[in-house]
């Protein structure tokens, strides 16, 4: 189905597993798929347009079917509906979407060399026990056409990771990645954003750091983990870092509140825009030279929550697709010619990463180069100064570095070249910003990509030393454990009592404000459940995740709806909150609200972006129930929301028919004046 409602033929490839992996047997067409449509102009001639492939299960075998990100959301929604009707899992499920772009991790060994084989990775993962619990999948998802994979339960993890894999066609060597591929990955994640708890991007290692950096800037107000990983050895090999990297990425994406684009490699989780490739043959191929890892996988998983970057912008997740292509990297070296510098700075160049010596130093005797840079800056070219060294940062206190600062070169602190390039493309692509704003943004820490001076120091609460003394706790590890046990419940209690000042004091002491209680509830859950608007606003301002779910599957927005706290609902929605319950569950809740004559609850559901036309298990809408119970006020409200009085349930009855059968003339007249309107809801996905 296309956006205008017409059916479009979409190629489906029937495949079978052979010695060469998946191979196409024949091509057929189907009107069932929704073909992907590009919304932005492709500017890179080297870019290869891509399609998403998903493994489709049928009685006759497995298919590789073309699918759009939007259609995949609908398929997974169907899967979620079916799973919830089955036996409950011992662990809550966390859903992860894996986007396979190519790279060594999914390759097949053939005649001693690794090569990409379409469809091979999704099939081979089915038979790797650490990556797929076949029994669990067969018990819970055997009837599904798009069948997921499931990690076995992981010790100390509170959720079971269930994941889906989509494969890009064609598979690419990472050297062939373009800006348009980054845009495609980011927009596919955006389309599926509200239906998954996290995302994993499988990528070749050569340009992995570039992709991670670019995604980190393009994805604005990110509230869920996006983990980029790859490997040096394919996942299906006997000796493989690919299996460990994929397992670690899935565990991280499905279990931890880390709303960043990260790179997972060799038991380390690193901020994406801080990561560089250091070695082309070792398993520890990536490192973060100027920042400690966010998390480390040992016997236990150690997450440094104080290192996680959280946006202080209270806004919904979005993707910025406009990247400036007219940028380049100019590496300074001894005796370089002025002609090469001038040629590099000529239009259409709009941005330059200047890679200088040491701490940002430039040869002071090369006034010709300095003059050429000054002329370029005066005509609007943005020049960012980055060190050629992997560690350390640009320092303008040296005369050789200050001379660049004085002519308008922007100090890049300790940004990697990959991050500086991605940031420059992103900032120059912000057409709504003027030149001074762009210069300011290049010097600001937008995504944790650079070190900046901090304002104020963390202070310890008086209660912790006293408790440590009373409990005879002396070692630093024991004191830290005491803090981790005591402070998070105090933070939740402050949210319950709407004590913002106490929350501020606790945060300044270094409390992990995203820690959960025994029901996996955060302070934002507690504040929303109690309708405490001031606490909700404060928690949102410090980056508390609106998507975190408790053990009952409720996020903070659901808690606010149940509390009928309209102001909290509005605030959480502005921060990107979204209710992703199944359609049938929403339909039952709406019908129940009508039965209870709870107009406030209906209005809160509507304010929360709920699709007001969802149906219950008999395909009855809330309007069916309102008419059968003769509730004129609710009927009028639901009609204003766009519900159709001619909608039939499983018994063939419409709301108008129900009014006629019950001789409810006033309701019949009210509905007869109904004019079809677009159903009002909070749906953010569009069929494209």
Which role fits each region the language model picked out?
Residues 517, 550, 583-584, 616, ...:
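Ankyrin repeat boundary/linker residues
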Residues 502, 534-535, 567-568, 600-601, ...:
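Conserved ankyrin/ankyrin-like repeat signature
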Residues 90-93, 99, 120-140, 149-157, ...:
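Accessory alpha-helical/coil subdomains and C-terminal extensions
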């Amino acid at each position: 189905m296309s956006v205008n409602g017409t059916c479009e033929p979409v190629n489906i490839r029937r495949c079978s597993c052979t010695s060469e992996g998946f191979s196409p047997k024949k091509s057929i067409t189907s009107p069932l798929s929704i073909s992907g449509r590009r919304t932005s102009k492709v500017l890179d001639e080297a870019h290869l347009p891509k399609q998403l492939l998903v493994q489709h299960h049928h009685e006759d075998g497995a298919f590789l079917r073309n699918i759009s990100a939007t259609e995949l959301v609908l398929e997974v929604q169907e899967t979620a509906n079916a799973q919830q009707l089955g036996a409950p899992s011992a662990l809550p499920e966390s859903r992860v979407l894996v986007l396979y772009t190519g790279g060594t991790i999914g390759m097949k060994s053939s005649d001693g060399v690794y090569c990409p084989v379409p469809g091979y990775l999704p099939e081979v993962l089915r038979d790797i026990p650490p990556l797929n619990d076949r029994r669990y999948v067969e018990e819970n998802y055997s009837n599904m056409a798009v069948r997921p994979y499931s990690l076995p339960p992981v010790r100390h993890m509170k959720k079971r990771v269930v994941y889906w894999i989509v494969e890009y066609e064609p598979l690419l060597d990472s050297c062939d990645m373009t800006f348009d591929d980054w845009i495609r990955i980011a927009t596919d994640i955006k389309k599926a954003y509200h239906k998954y708890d996290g995302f994993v991007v499988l990528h070749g290692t050569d340009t992995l750091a570039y992709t991670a950096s670019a995604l980190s800037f393009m994805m604005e107000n990110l509230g869920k983990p996006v983990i980029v990983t790859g490997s040096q050895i394919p996942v299906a090999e006997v000796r493989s870092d690919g299996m460990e990297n994929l397992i670690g990425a899935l565990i991280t994406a499905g279990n931890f509140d880390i709303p960043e684009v990260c790179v997972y490699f060799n038991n380390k989780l690193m901020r994406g825009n801080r990561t560089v490739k250091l070695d082309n043959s070792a398993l520890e191929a990536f490192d973060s030279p100027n920042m400690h890892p966010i998390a480390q996988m040992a016997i236990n998983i150690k997450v440094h929550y104080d290192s996680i970057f959280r946006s202080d912008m209270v806004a919904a997740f979005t993707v910025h697709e406009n990247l400036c292509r007219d940028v380049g990297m100019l590496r300074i070296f001894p005796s370089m010619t002025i002609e090469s510098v001038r040629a590099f700075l000529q239009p259409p160049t709009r941005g330059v990463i200047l890679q200088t010596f040491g701490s940002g130093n430039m040869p002071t005797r090369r006034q010709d180069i300095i003059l050429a840079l000054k002329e370029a800056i005066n005509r609007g070219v943005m020049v960012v100064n980055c060190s050629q060294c992997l560690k350390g940062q640009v320092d303008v206190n040296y005369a050789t570095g200050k001379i660049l600062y004085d002519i308008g070169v922007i100090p890049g602190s300790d940004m990697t070249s990959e991050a500086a390039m991605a940031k420059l493309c992103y900032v120059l692509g912000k057409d709504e910003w003027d030149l001074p704003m762009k210069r300011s943004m290049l010097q600001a820490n937008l995504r944790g990509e650079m070190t900046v001076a901090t304002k104020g120091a963390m202070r310890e609460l008086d209660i912790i030393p006293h408790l440590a003394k009373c409990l005879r706790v002396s070692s630093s590890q024991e004191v830290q454990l005491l803090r981790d046990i005591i402070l998070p419940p105090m933070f939740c209690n402050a949210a319950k009592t709407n004590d913002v000042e106490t929350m501020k004091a606790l945060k300044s002491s270094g409390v992990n404000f995203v820690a959960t209680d025994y029901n996996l509830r955060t302070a934002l859950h507690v504040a929303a459940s109690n309708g405490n608007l001031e606490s909700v606003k404060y928690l949102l301002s410090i980056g508390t995740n609106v998507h975190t779910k408790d053990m009952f599957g409720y996020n903070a927005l659901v808690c606010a709806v149940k509390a009928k706290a309209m102001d909290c609902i509005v605030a959480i929605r502005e921060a990107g909150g979204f209710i992703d319950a199944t359609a049938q569950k929403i339909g039952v809740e709406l019908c129940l609200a009508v039965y209870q004559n709870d107009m406030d609850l209906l209005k809160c559901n509507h304010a929360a972006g709920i699709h007001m036309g969802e149906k219950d298990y008999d395909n009855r809408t809330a309007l069916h129930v309102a008419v059968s119970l003769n509730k004129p006020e609710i009927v009028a409200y639901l009609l204003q929301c766009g519900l159709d009085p001619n909608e039939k349930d499983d018994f063939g009855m419409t709301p108008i028919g129900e009014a006629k059968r019950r001789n409810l003339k006033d309701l019949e007249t009210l509905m007869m004046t109904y004019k079809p309107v677009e159903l009002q809801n909070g749906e953010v996905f569009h069929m494209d």
